[in-house]
Regions:
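N-terminal strand-loop element at the rim of the active site
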Residues: 5-13, 17-21, 25-69, 160, ...
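Aromatic "clamp/platform" in nucleotide-sugar-dependent glycosyltransferases that forms part
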Residues: 265, 284
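Membrane-proximal helix-turn-helix segments that form the acceptor-binding/catalytic region
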Residues: 79-83, 133-153
Length: 377
């Protein structure tokens, strides 16, 4: 069976990591997998093994921000991608980004493939981050009209599906919930690598993710400021992004330089995660929350915001880790202090490891294959 993974912009991130794991397993099972892209970063390519075929289409308008150039770029991509699809004749196309272009390809390609859209974020929450009411309405209108033109939608959490059904009026029967394959056993081996730029002398809280407004590091820092008034510990933040300056300013203005370390982007964050005592996710919203599962796989306790959509589902509403309401730094500080003083680490660690198996590559890929095969009956 042949399938195209349609990712016009292949960068470093959760989408790429998840799809690389699924593609690897599909190839093991005998599937013919091809990755179709327009922008291919070194980091993005590094997620995928040599066994997967990658077709990169060149256009003269790559990385252009002006609207006219973006429209021209999409038109050229449509022409070139359509030719490739007609020549290769994939049975399925799984689109992870640029859904309008994917739907246009389905409508106007000679090869009649089955189109699956992989929705990784609550579309309503994502639209609201635009900070432009008119643009928000346009995005939601387009999604409401275009999504039903696909053959199947894979939502990476129940919360994402609920939003698609309740807010965009999409038929629930065409949506399957399939979580991310975040419990990759390779992480365990990578976690054993030596760390030479940080010593874990004190109790260490770790946060891993892009430094963006979505990740809400300021709430974490406010909570941490309260925590260090009560006990000695450190905060390790791994990631890079547009909010770095604001985070650095807060650390400096609140005299936290001796307690907080920003390590920047790390290709192997798991070697730091495995040596930490606690992982905290402070996001305002998430599609899923891969790093929560990765923490559980490594036996690291988790505290997460109760944000839309994935974290509370992963933690089963607090059964496998503590939750707090977004922006509530006081509650977060209480939970951190409780975790630091907890005597049940070994038991909770074993329970978390067991829960992480629900997100194994084998189990999740099996669900993807089932979703594909349903379209052939």
């Amino acid at each position: 069976m042949n399938i195209f993974f349609f990712i016009p912009s292949l960068e470093k991130g959760g989408i790429e990591r998840s799809l690389s794991r699924i593609s690897r397993k599909l190839i093991e099972l005998g599937w013919d997998v091809t990755l179709l892209t327009n922008e291919l970063s070194i980091e993005g390519k590094s997620y995928f093994e040599d066994s997967i075929k990658i077709i990169k289409v060149e256009t003269p308008f790559e990385n252009k921000k002006f609207l006219l150039f973006q429209l021209l770029n999409n038109f050229l991509l449509f022409i070139k991608f359509r030719k490739i699809i007609n020549n290769h004749k994939p049975k399925f196309v799984l689109a992870a980004k640029n859904f309008p272009l994917a739907i246009m390809l389905k409508k106007f390609s000679k090869n009649k493939f089955k189109l699956i859209l992989r929705e990784a974020v609550d579309p309503y929450v994502a639209a609201n981050t635009q900070r432009n009411f008119i643009l928000e309405r346009i995005i939601l209108f387009l999604k409401k009209k275009l999504y039903p033109k696909s053959d199947r939608i894979i939502a990476i959490s129940q919360g994402v599906k609920d939003s698609l059904v309740n807010k965009l009026s999409i038929d629930a029967k065409m949506i399957n919930v399939v979580y991310n394959p975040a419990a990759d056993e390779k992480i365990i081996d990578l976690s054993l690598e030596i760390t030479d730029d940080y010593s874990f002398k004190n109790y260490t809280i770790v946060n891993i993710g892009r430094l963006t407004r979505q990740k809400d590091h300021l709430t974490l820092l406010k909570a941490f400021k309260l925590v260090i008034k009560e006990t000695k510990c450190n905060l390790l933040i791994i990631g890079e992004g547009s909010e770095r300056q604001n985070i650095e300013n807060y650390i400096r203005n609140n005299d936290l330089e001796n307690y907080v370390k920003l390590l920047g982007y790390k290709s192997n964050p798991w070697k730091y995660l495995s040596r930490s005592n606690l992982f905290v996710l402070s996001s305002i919203w998430e599609g899923f929350g891969n790093v929560i599962v990765e923490s559980m796989l490594l036996g690291i306790p988790v505290i997460s915001s109760r944000c839309k959509s994935g974290p509370a589902e992963i933690l089963d509403n607090g059964k496998y880790g503590n939750l707090y309401d977004i922006y509530d730094h006081n509650k977060l500080s209480e939970l951190i202090l409780h975790e630091i003083s907890s005597k049940e680490l070994e038991n909770s660690s074993n329970i978390a490891k067991k829960r992480s198996k629900d997100f194994s590559i084998d189990k999740i890929t099996e669900s993807y294959i089932k979703s594909f095969e349903e379209l052939l009956t």
